[in-house]
């Protein structure tokens, strides 16, 4: 049986609590436990890159981690992955800060990681690469003679050609991506956007619906919407509340709660969300004194100017809205710029009447799915969800809104606050059914199954891939 080798920018710590954070770690550990194998990634520390890999083995899984120099971390991670790819892939070209040394550093680190992984690989290993930090990784492995099956999953959106082609190195990135055997995306829109970018650059031959050839390289594209652990989330959400939370719930028993939790990131649409809540207060004064909106937004990448700007903007908007609409004994908006334990958040989800999840652009947004999974099926809250979140393709029974239209969001919030119990139960049941079917284990099992079905590349095909090809004639 083939081993599974997983490569991601960071690896979860090898202890029994690693999966408690949810998300990617749960899916990866599930796949690794099933097949046995290796999880390879950055240690999270800076230091001498020439030091031997740190290896830890538990059961049939080995964790292998490495350090990065401060220069490599800054250029590969901060300056290119997060200052070029992240904003561009979230349709924010105005925030892209392209610098040629950062691009060189991005390629250099991907090559370095390929060098470090190469001695660990076995001939029949199946390799699964994750996310935008490692777009060129398969290309670097192929250059080193690796013919193993290599899959890639992009957790964030893939932009349309008008956005992607603005990147000075877009053509190189596209050709490098074709060195993967299987390219996985969150949504069909993302998959088609990638193919549109590719067909604008070179001739793409499609042998079947999702099997393609470009530059002489054969690859497959597919959609794998990432899921969650609904049973675990329901378990975390149920049970007694911590004393302070129980006291707060008692104090707010006559108040309807709108709740939202996101990383402090410009892609999440937080300023637009605050303005939509203000529109609700303005257009529906009957809710004054009877509702409260709580926004939790812990700082991420606090040293980046764009993130500092949005933090200050939110602080100002929260103060302005509370000053305009607040009353003695009633504060309409609570904004908390701090981290909360994930299990506590699931309990807060459960007693919230409305979950407000309105990113401007998001690959999936697991918060939306977690909110649904945390609800009491007999008395569930209502999910208000952005049409630009990948989750909107699955959670069609949510109240789907355009986050740029504050009036539309306000109308949806009013509808959510006044929705009948019967409708709430019906909508929740439909969404929960989808979430249970497409859980995190289903996601990883589908990807790994498809990757296993691909015939490994041969040395001869690697040589054929080096034959010159020409761009599509326009």
UniProtKB/Swiss-Prot annotation:
Gene3D superfamilies, sorted: Glycogen Phosphorylase B
Positions contributing to D-glucose 6-phosphate binding: 10, 77, 131, 301
Pathway annotation from the record: Glycan biosynthesis; trehalose biosynthesis
Residues carrying the site annotation Involved in alpha anomer selectivity: 86, 156
Record's keyword terms, sorted: Glycosyltransferase, Transferase
GO biological process, one term: trehalose biosynthetic process
Family stated for the protein in its record: Belongs to the glycosyltransferase 20 family.
Protein name: Trehalose-6-phosphate synthase
């Amino acid at each position: 049986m083939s081993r599974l080798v997983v490569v991601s920018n960071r690896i979860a710590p090898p202890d029994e609590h690693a999966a408690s954070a949810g998300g990617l770690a749960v899916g990866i550990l599930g796949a690794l436990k099933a097949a046995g194998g290796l999880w390879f990634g950055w240690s999270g520390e800076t230091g001498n890159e020439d030091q031997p890999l740190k290896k830890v083995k538990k059961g049939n899984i080995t964790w292998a981690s490495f350090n990065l120099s401060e220069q490599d971390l800054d250029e590969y991670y901060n300056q290119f992955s997060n200052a070029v790819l992240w904003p561009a892939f979230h349709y924010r070209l105005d925030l892209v800060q392209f610098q040629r040394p950062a691009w060189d550093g991005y390629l250099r680190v991907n090559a370095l990681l390929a060098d470090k992984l190469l001695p660990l690989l076995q001939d029949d290993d199946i390799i699964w690469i994750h996310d935008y930090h490692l777009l060129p990784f398969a290309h670097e492995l192929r250059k080193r003679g690796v013919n193993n099956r290599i899959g890639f999953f992009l957790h964030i959106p893939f932009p349309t050609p008008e956005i992607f082609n603005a990147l000075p190195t877009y053509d190189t990135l596209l050709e490098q991506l074709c060195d993967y055997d299987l390219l996985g995306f969150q949504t069909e829109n993302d998959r088609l956007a990638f193919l549109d970018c590719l067909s604008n650059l070179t001739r793409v031959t499609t042998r079947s619906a999702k099997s393609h050839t470009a530059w002489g390289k054969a690859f497959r594209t597919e959609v794998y919407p990432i899921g969650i652990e609904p049973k675990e989330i329901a378990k975390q959400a149920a049970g007694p509340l911590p004393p302070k939370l129980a006291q707060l719930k008692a104090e707010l028993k006559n108040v309807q709660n709108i709740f939202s939790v996101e990383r402090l990131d410009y892609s999440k649409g937080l300023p637009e969300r605050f303005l939509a809540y203000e529109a609700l207060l303005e257009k529906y004064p009957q809710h004054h004194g009877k509702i409260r909106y709580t926004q939790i937004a812990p700082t991420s990448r606090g040293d980046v100017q764009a993130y500092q700007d949005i933090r200050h903007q939110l602080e100002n908007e929260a103060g302005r809205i509370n000053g305009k609409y607040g009353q003695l004994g009633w504060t309409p908006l609570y904004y908390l710029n701090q981290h909360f334990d994930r299990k506590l958040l699931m309990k807060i989800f459960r007693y919230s009447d409305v979950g407000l999840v309105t990113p401007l652009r998001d690959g999936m947004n697991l918060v939306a799915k977690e909110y649904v999974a945390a609800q009491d099926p007999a008395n569930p809250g209502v999910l208000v969800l952005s049409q630009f979140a990948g989750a909107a393709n699955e959670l069609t029974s949510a109240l789907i809104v355009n986050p740029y239209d504050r009036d539309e969001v306000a109308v949806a919030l009013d509808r959510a606050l006044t929705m009948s119990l019967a409708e709430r139960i019906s909508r929740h049941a439909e969404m929960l059914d989808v979430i249970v079917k497409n859980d995190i284990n289903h996601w990883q099992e589908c990807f790994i199954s498809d990757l296993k079905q691909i015939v490994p590349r041969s040395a001869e095909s690697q040589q054929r891939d080096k034959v010159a090809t020409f761009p599509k004639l326009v």
